[in-house]
């Protein structure tokens, strides 16, 4: 009888270990599929390689536009948009992330008024960067308004150095933005408070820089990712997959990127904003980065009696 009990216990233990092993493999496998698609680096500028601030077009891969409600309208606006009034002379610049040597970040600096403030532009992903029409148009709008700008490629994007096959959703990239700030202070003699920043889509992770650097005087967040686990859930739901896959995606993504993807949060900027102005804009029907990101950020700012303004746009996606 004792022999049979011992044999049964061994079988139960073996089954348990087998189940645990298979479950672990499945967890890692699911996480890898989710994370590798979500955070794979895609450096270079692709079809926009020839774009520069003084000579760019709105050309795009029109077939790649997803069938959102406003896609047709957006395509028509872009095809017929005259960019000639938004092309400006610029300076090629380079600098390193704050606290990290050996990584060169490359950007375009436009100065229209030596006495004006400056805005650092932070792009989204995947194949993205300073060369995309959206970023160049923003630089043109700022110049038209008499505001200087620095638009640059984060590490692993555009023409900046590649140090990994994966991006880290702001966990490392916020240091790139701090490097841009330091360059403006040291090389262009701006004073703290004269430098603002914008963050678009997945570039929202760089808002951590706003939390760390009180010299950044203002922040504009456009359809920004401010909660990485939430955006993974958003994307899984959009593609028709169970949202509980987000957990392994975040965990394995951290292993791939070499840093926990939840170590820092852009929501820290809402806690540390003080009286610095923050503007949030978001499409109410955004299927990729849900409006909940901006709403949560707004709520945090309000609870801290901070200076926040919002524009949530009806019938608009990402």
Question: Language-model features: where?
Answer:
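Short beta-strand/loop motif that positions the catalytic acidic residue
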Residues: 273-274, 279-282, 286
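Hydrolase active-site cap/lid region
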Residues: 209-260
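Short beta-strand element of the alpha/beta-hydrolase
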Residues: 116-124
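Alpha/beta-hydrolase active-site loop
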Residues: 167-188
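N-terminal cap/lid segment of alpha/beta-hydrolase-fold proteins
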Residues: 68-114
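Conserved alpha/beta-hydrolase "acid-adjacent" motif
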Residues: 287-293
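N-terminal targeting or regulatory segments adjacent to alpha/beta-hydrolase or S9 domains
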Residues: 1-83
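Conserved alpha/beta-hydrolase
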Residues: 139-161
């Amino acid at each position: 009888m004792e022999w049979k009990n011992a044999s049964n216990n061994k079988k139960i233990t073996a089954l348990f270990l087998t189940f645990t092993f298979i479950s672990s493999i499945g967890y890692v496998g699911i996480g890898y599929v989710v994370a590798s698609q979500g955070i794979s680096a895609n450096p270079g500028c692709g079809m926009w390689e020839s774009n520069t601030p003084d000579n760019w077009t709105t050309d795009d891969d029109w077939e790649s536009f997803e069938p959102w409600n406003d896609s047709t309208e957006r395509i028509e606006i872009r095809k017929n948009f005259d960019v000639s009034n938004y092309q400006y002379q610029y300076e090629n610049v380079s600098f390193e992330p704050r606290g990290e040597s050996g990584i060169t970040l490359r950007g375009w600096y436009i100065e229209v008024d030596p006495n004006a403030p400056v805005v650092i532009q932070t792009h989204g992903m995947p194949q993205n960067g300073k060369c995309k029409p959206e970023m160049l148009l923003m630089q043109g709008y700022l110049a038209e308004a008499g505001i200087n700008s620095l638009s640059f490629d984060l590490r692993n994007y555009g023409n900046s150095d590649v140090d990994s096959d994966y991006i880290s959703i702001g966990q490392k990239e916020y240091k790139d933005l701090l490097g841009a700030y330091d360059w403006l202070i040291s090389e262009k003699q701006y004073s703290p408070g004269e430098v603002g920043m914008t963050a678009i889509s997945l570039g929202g992770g760089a808002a951590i820089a706003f939390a760390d650097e009180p010299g950044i005087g203002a922040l504009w967040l456009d359809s920004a990712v401010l909660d990485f686990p939430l955006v993974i859930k958003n994307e899984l739901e959009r593609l028709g997959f169970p949202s509980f896959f987000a957990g392994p995606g975040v965990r394995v993504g951290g292993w791939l990127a070499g840093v926990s993807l939840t170590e820092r949060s852009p929501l820290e900027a809402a806690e540390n904003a003080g009286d610095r102005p923050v503007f949030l804009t978001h499409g109410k029907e955004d299927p990729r980065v849900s409006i909940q990101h901006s709403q949560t950020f707004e709520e945090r700012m309000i609870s801290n009696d901070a200076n926040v303004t919002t524009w949530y746009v009806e019938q608009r996606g990402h």
